[in-house]
A protein has these predicted regions:
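Short intrinsically disordered coil segments
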Residues: 98, 241-242
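Short amphipathic alpha-helical segments with coiled-coil-like heptad repeat character
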Residues: 2, 89-92, 212-216
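Fold-level signature of zinc-dependent metallopeptidase catalytic domains
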Residues: 156-216, 220, 226-236, 242-243, ...
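Beta-strand-enriched, solvent-exposed domains that form extended recognition/catalytic surfaces
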Residues: 31-157
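Bacterial Sec-dependent N-terminal signal peptides
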Residues: 1-24
Length: 281
């Protein structure tokens, strides 16, 4: 049987979940444009020391994240990003995250061998200069590493992406696309001539999702697209079988030497394939 891999990028329910928190007072249009600032970082180190490095900044057409409660954290994570308006010192955006790097820190390998991991975070594109603070937390919720850097939105070295790299197929349009949950299926391990198979597999996965509550009754809140990113080889790599394949995202089993743990470490590639499609994380 041929192997098929479908990577899901499911956007958090930030736009429709009722958060029991104080209403935020940051107006999106006062501080941001309708674009995305992609923050590419390298997280590196071992159990004794973790470091954060800026890799690249990218401006992508369109912003598909939340536009309300911008300065409030929607959920806890193992790290967080805070944007502060440089002129006023006001916090204008916060978001939390959890990364594969931080998961790896719990492994035996992290005790003896320093490694680095790509990480990509999306924030709304600022109108004016901002300070960006990145914090990593340890297992006791203490800050283990932090980096603060300044971003001028007019910086000529911010790379711009204005159009999708791949064809985007809409499987289902939400009743209200300004207030919805966005799902993007990314083709990984499908050749160019297999895109019909990819779309069919995505449809099967979609129907399986909506067979269950609360998804069935909330179906109209979901906006679902497919990103047709072709691979040279079919399937995914399985290192413990010495089976390596050339795929768009370089995904493989055996992450952290666990046979069934399937991931991609190439997050910049993933976000390049997704660029300008309607997704948030």
């Amino acid at each position: 049987m041929k192997t098929r891999l479908l990577l899901f990028l499911i956007v958090i329910f930030t736009n429709i979940i009722k958060v029991n928190a104080q209403q935020g007072d940051v107006c999106f249009n006062d501080y941001f444009t309708d674009n995305t600032l992609r923050l590419d970082y390298i997280f590196a180190g071992d159990t004794s020391r973790q470091l954060i490095f800026v890799d690249e900044l990218v401006k992508v057409k369109g912003w598909y994240g939340r536009r309300k409660r911008l300065e409030l954290l929607p959920y806890e994570g193992n790290g967080q990003i805070t944007l502060t308006d440089k002129a006023s010192g006001k916090t204008i955006y916060r978001h939390s995250f959890s990364t594969l790097f931080q998961e790896w820190l719990s492994s035996d390998e992290a005790k003896t061998t320093p490694k680095s991991f790509e990480n990509v975070f999306l924030v709304p594109f600022p109108k004016s200069t901002v300070d960006v603070k990145v914090e990593l937390f340890d297992f006791h919720r203490k800050v283990s590493s932090t980096l603060t850097h300044t971003i001028d939105p007019n910086d000529i070295l911010i790379r711009e992406i204005q159009r999708p790299k791949n064809p985007i197929v809409t499987l289902q349009q939400a009743d209200d696309t300004t207030n919805c949950i966005r799902i993007a299926y990314v083709a990984e391990g499908y050749k160019k001539e297999q895109m019909d198979d990819f779309i069919n597999d995505a449809k099967i996965a979609t129907e399986a999702l909506f067979e269950h509550e609360p998804f069935t009754s909330m179906r109209g809140y979901f906006n679902i697209v497919c990103v047709e990113s072709p691979s040279e080889n079919e399937g995914t790599s399985t290192p413990h079988k010495k089976d390596w394949r050339n795929t768009t995202l370089g995904s493989h089993f055996d992450t952290f030497y666990s046979n069934r743990y399937l991931t991609t470490l190439h997050l910049k590639k993933l976000h390049d394939e997704l660029a300008c499609s309607p997704y948030e994380h």
